[in-house]
Amino acid sequence: MVTASIAAKLTDFELERNRTDDDIATLEASLRQSPTDLEKQTRLAYRLYHRATLTESAAHYQATQAVISAAISQFGPKEDLCLLKANLDFRFHRLAAVHRDLEMAPKLPGRFEARSILADLAFQQGRYREARETYEKLIEEDRTWDNLARLAHYHGKMGDMGLADRLYAEAEDELTAKEMRSFSWVELQRGVLNMAQGRYEDAADRYRRADMAYSGYWLIQEHIAEALAAAGKFHEAAALYRDVISRTPKPELQQTLGELYVFMGEAGQAEPWFERALSAYLDSAKRGDVHYYHHLTDFYADVRQDGAAAAEWARMDLELRENFSTQAALAWALFRNGEIDASLDWMSRALSSGAADAELFQQAAAIYKAAGQSSESQRFLGRAAAINPHYGNFHVHR
């Protein structure tokens, strides 16, 4: 239990984490007395999932998965449990499992929340029009903040930054004063849009607003670190990354810190962070997890510049979810491996999606140049600069 004097010193993130831990402990104690209580078992699964999304701890996600599986085994495929399992599987890129999860409960695919997941699934699988139309239909039925944010994300990826920002603003309008973590997350996404356009001060302002709305959240601080690095404040950014990693040792953050050190000309400082990141990625893959395939592709393509290894991971990722992101990742890996014709083919597929992003266009420019198509290369360099005239500044591959 947190006393009032201690609570006053804790951040919003710490307070929520403590409340969640207390809820979990209370539910676990109660279930030891009444293990057949379906309502409490379901609430426990949801609170465990909430804690895992706060901390992004692999152990917390594993605990959540174990409780969900045990509850479904004990009580059968209840809708709320299957919906939670679908959310968990989607987060870890187990997309085939998402369909199975939703179909375990016959009426579940028609539920509003399940239709949102199916729209997300369509986007991840390259069915962009279906995803957009489903988001729009869901918003017509019920103007929820999360579906407005989903549609905003879609338009941001497709290059309409103005519409994306307006939709995020509308999402904020749907939130109440009790939903400050959600508000801060939406502010964070608006900052991400600013970063993608090279508007670093605007992004930093958004991130500061997010931090004021919900203090102490490592996710916000990680984005603040990127904004600092993009603005040339490298040592300040590196210090903040180290602080975030000390609390949330995610391998993608370790890789980012290593890349920042390389950008600063301090390759010796980078290597230990790269080794830690790669070890975690590979350990995850050995356990049968698939959600780091994209990171392994990026790591081998850009950190190690090992095109053959990058292409191997890229193909595995693409088998799970073929979309412009995985197509472009394979194209870049093939480029690194000197397979220019194949690289050009996959990049053409990625570009045909309509996605518009400075990094995508910069990579396209390099591939077209290698293929001897200099005019196309220049055109894509121009498109990259039109989106973000400061693309050469430090940025995170997301």
Say what each PLM segment does.
Residues 43, 84, 117-118, 150, ...:
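Canonical tetratricopeptide repeat
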Residues 46, 53, 87, 120, ...:
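Residue-level recognition of tetratricopeptide repeat
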Residues 51, 55-58, 92, 125, ...:
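Structural motif corresponding to the intra-repeat A-B loop/turn of tetratricopeptide repeats
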